[in-house]
């Protein structure tokens, strides 16, 4: 939620491959976990090495290496490559390709990685360290996710997947989502060396180790949170599980590298990905001597920048909306409409691509359709609890919906009983839809009988796969009285609604 930048497949800017994958989350099918309060049932350590036949029992089953955390430091990778003992044998495989060869070199390198890995497996190598170290003007890095997915599925098809574990030494992965997708497509551990080098560059010498540990800890916590949204408690169970949906990836690429991943709208292939990564490389090794060109491009993905990514909300649209609403100016609002429509900023979402075929449509007489009053009965606000928005906003929404014959929703925060009685001017602040959620805040008999609809929330909508939490300092006397709780005590909505069982 809240991402107003274009989908990766609709962006004018080059995109890393991670951007095309969206995380899945549990709703009613299986309950998500609370990664903070249920941490005792989770495990982020992993075992790497060759897996033996499950139906036999030999000492070789124990010839595995335990890695306590899946984000590895530079020195830990070096130590791993030095090990050659009790079935653990690690070798590095380069994931670079020749820039001059373009797409041909891109595909050649991908194919060579597969054959090189097979060759090493035949030599009893049990851990492959894929590495994109050594990038220079003539050598670029293959997309780490493409290498992971392609190799993972190649080994599955070759019946070799249980013979080896894959670890990635990559400068590309730097965010929690990047790590999660790599684990999801078969990578056991990651050494994000550029991210770690960046931490070092931003740290004082005496703080470097502590900051490095903080980065690793935060990254692992983020991956755990991502896993928890699907109700998966161990990283070993998440690895290779492919709990993602592709948005903008073509069928051919899905079949070769991301098999069994849903990709409902089709999209790009190897050629487009190669073009984007060659552009990344070209920008990194630009011949320009202009000082401004030597700075890293901010990109503007998360925050609007004049030369960055397009956004549905920009300084112009926000300014026009604020001015039109505060001054009740219809002319300014029309300018806001023009600035916010798709022709102004281009296609950002899938719905921007849809058009109504007015020419071949047959008009229906107004007498044959429902009246405005009947249609408005189906209009409803989102379920936004009192506390997440102010008392004034919550009550104003209810009054507005009641005036037009539509319905407002209390959200899961309860409702002031004084609102059940109409105001002297005839307005009603009573929300027609009363919500019962996992925390059951403010749910009383009086609350339920003053509703037109009772909405039982099976799972979180605004925070998919997560619960909600309000810190204690926000629980005022008024909020506590409505939620039937104690002032100053934090409130938690569990991720699942336990009545679903």
Language model features with spans:
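Flexible, glycine-rich loop/tail regions that form catalytic "lids" or insertion modules at the edges
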Residues: 1-107, 116-120, 124-127, 178-179, ...
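Conserved short loop/turn motifs at secondary-structure junctions
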Residues: 6, 131-140, 165-172, 383-387
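Glycine-rich, proline-tolerant flexible connector loops at the mouths of alpha/beta enzymes
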Residues: 130-146, 417-419, 465, 489-500
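Catalytic-face loop-and-helix region of soluble metabolic enzyme cores
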Residues: 160, 198-199, 205-209
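Alpha-helix-loop-beta-strand connector modules within alpha/beta enzyme cores
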Residues: 140-168, 215-221, 225, 449
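Flexible glycine-/small-residue-enriched beta->alpha junction loops
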Residues: 461, 466-490
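Catalytic cores of alpha/beta
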Residues: 172-186
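Conserved, mostly hydrophobic/aromatic
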Residues: 132, 151, 182, 234, ...
């Amino acid at each position: 939620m809240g991402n107003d930048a274009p989908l990766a497949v609709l962006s004018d800017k080059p995109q890393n491959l991670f951007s095309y994958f969206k995380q899945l989350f549990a709703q009613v099918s299986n309950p998500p976990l609370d990664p903070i309060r249920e941490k005792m049932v989770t495990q982020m350590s992993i075992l790497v090495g060759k897996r033996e036949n499950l139906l036999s029992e030999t000492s070789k089953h124990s010839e595995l290496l335990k890695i306590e955390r899946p984000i590895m430091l530079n020195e830990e990778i070096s130590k791993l490559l030095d090990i050659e003992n009790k079935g653990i044998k690690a070798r590095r495989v380069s994931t670079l390709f020749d820039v001059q060869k373009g797409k041909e070199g891109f595909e050649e390198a991908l194919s060579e990685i597969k054959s090189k890995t097979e060759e090493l497996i035949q030599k009893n190598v049990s851990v492959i360290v894929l590495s994109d170290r050594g990038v220079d003007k003539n050598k670029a890095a293959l997309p780490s996710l493409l290498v992971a997915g392609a190799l993972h599925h190649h080994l599955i098809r070759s019946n070799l997947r249980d013979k080896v574990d894959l670890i990635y030494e990559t400068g590309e992965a730097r965010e929690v989502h990047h790590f999660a997708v790599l684990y999801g497509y078969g990578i056991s551990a990651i050494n994000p060396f550029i991210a770690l080098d960046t931490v070092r560059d931003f740290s004082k010498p005496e703080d470097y180790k502590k900051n490095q540990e903080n980065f690793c800890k935060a990254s692992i916590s983020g991956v755990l949170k991502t896993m928890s949204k699907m109700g998966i408690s161990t990283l070993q169970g998440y690895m290779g599980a492919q709990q993602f949906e592709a948005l903008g990836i073509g069928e051919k690429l899905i079949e070769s590298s991301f098999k069994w991943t849903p990709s409902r709208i089709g999209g790009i292939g190897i050629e487009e990905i190669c073009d984007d990564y060659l552009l990344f490389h070209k920008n990194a090794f630009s011949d320009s001597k202009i000082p401004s060109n030597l700075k890293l491009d901010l990109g503007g993905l998360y925050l609007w920048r004049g030369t960055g990514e397009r956004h549905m909300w920009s300084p112009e649209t926000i300014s026009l909306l604020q001015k039109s609403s505060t001054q009740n100016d219809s002319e300014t609002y029309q300018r806001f409409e023009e600035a916010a429509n798709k022709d102004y900023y281009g296609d950002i979402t899938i719905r921007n691509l849809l058009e109504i075929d007015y020419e071949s449509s047959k008009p229906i007489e107004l007498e044959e359709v429902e009246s405005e009053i009947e249609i408005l009965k189906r209009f409803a606000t989102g379920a936004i609890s009192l506390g997440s928005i102010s008392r004034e906003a919550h009550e104003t929404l209810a009054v507005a919906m009641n005036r037009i014959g539509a319905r407002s929703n209390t959200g899961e925060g309860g409702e002031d009983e004084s609102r059940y009685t109409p105001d002297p001017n005839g307005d009603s602040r009573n929300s027609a839809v009363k919500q019962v959620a996992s925390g059951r805040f403010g749910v009383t008999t009086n609350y339920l009988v003053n509703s037109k609809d009772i909405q039982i929330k099976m799972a979180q909508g605004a925070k998919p796969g997560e619960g909600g939490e309000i810190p204690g300092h926000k629980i005022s006397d008024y909020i506590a009285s409505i939620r039937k709780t104690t002032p100053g005590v934090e409130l938690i909505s569990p991720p699942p609604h336990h009545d679903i069982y």
